[in-house]
Amino acid sequence: MYYLEHELKQTDPSKIAYIAFSNAAADEAKKRITNDNVIVSTMHAFGSRELQLNTSTHLLKGDKWKGFKNFSNICADLSFESYINESGYPQYKNSHMKIIEYAKNKRIPLDEAALQLELHYSTDIYLTEQIQADLITYKEQTGMFEYSDMISKFVEEDKCPPIHTVFLDEAQDLSPLQWEMFFYIESKSQRSYVAGDDDQTIYTFQGADPDIFINLKGITDPQIKSRRVPRTIHKLAESIFPHMSQRLEKQWEPRDAEGKIYNDIPYQDIDFSTGNWMVLTRTNKMLTALKDHMYDLNLRFEAKQQELLPKRMVNAYRVWTRLNQGAFVNKEDLKDLWDYLTVKDGHLVRGYASNKTLESITSIDMEGLRAEYGLRAAGSWEILNFPESSKMYI
């Protein structure tokens, strides 16, 4: 934040854009940036806002895919089930859509995308090409759009607002499509600041290209001392680097703590009842047994999928938590939250109970909801109108 504070001393805050790769990074930045006039956003949210896209009516997601399946006979029996990951991109189970999304993000032909994803043997690429062609036609005729269009159309339609300085965070995980958007914004700006670490790239499976970050030109300011990694973990990480085919050579020192590594300990033997824990697994499937274990212990936890609770309840909990942290949220997220707020319980002013009152919202924080949308609820998530039988699983 040092460079941002420096810019705020000499630049109109409304002409500063802070672009974060993930929703989590954007939320964290909103908590740390005290000047409300600075534009803090993910690329998708920024593009959607400037393009004035209606994500509730024209974004292809969920049931909205039914229209396309009726339009394209070859897609009638295909599933378009997906979830939106932290970077704002849909993750499809359908191999054709995996290839199409990857190709758009990487800016490469479909057959090359299928090869890189190792789907060239199991997927009919000619069918993939026809699905893509039908999808383009359908969007042209209906005005529907996909998540990637929030970025590509932002550039194509020259929608960048007046910006003097742009900041980019977590740059190592940007795809070529996202880099196009950043370079376009940068071309409209006087100064740019880019933060990232190619060693931390994790989204290559959806098209991230750390080589673009590695090859950037400009003045560098290496952050040598780690604030997180103790010596033991640092030593393990250093042993991995020689096996990486391409990386930016850098000096990197551990923080002043020893740290510990425990190998081959069954998760059943770990005491999760004290402290805060983050559990990472290589695949989502591996989390299933861990989640069941947490349920058995009556421990509260947050995960992308909690089958014992309705998705809208989990989303309402997350949205309320984010709002209390100072984050901005969109109207789609708020609609789930509003289902658990009532006038009777003092959560809302009379006349604001219907989530239809939220239609004009693009992005808003807790203060805005209190000032303009009748919100009166305050406190932890327990005040939400959740069934008592469900609260123990949150």
Predicted feature locations:
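A polyampholytic, Gly/Pro-enriched intrinsically disordered region
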Residues: 56-76, 214, 240-248, 316-347
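Conserved phosphoryl-transfer catalytic core
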Residues: 57-85, 188-201, 217-226
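Accessory N-terminal region flanking or inserted into the helicase ATPase core
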Residues: 79-167, 176-181, 204
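Conserved helicase motor core of SF1/SF2 NTP-dependent helicases
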Residues: 21-24, 41-44, 161, 165, ...
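Short, polar/flexible loop-turn hinges at active-site or ligand-entry regions and domain interfaces
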Residues: 11-15, 35-37, 51-67, 161, ...
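Conserved helicase C-terminal RecA-like lobe
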Residues: 320-394
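P-loop NTPase Walker
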Residues: 1-58, 235-238
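Conserved interdomain hinge at the start of the Helicase C-terminal
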Residues: 259-275
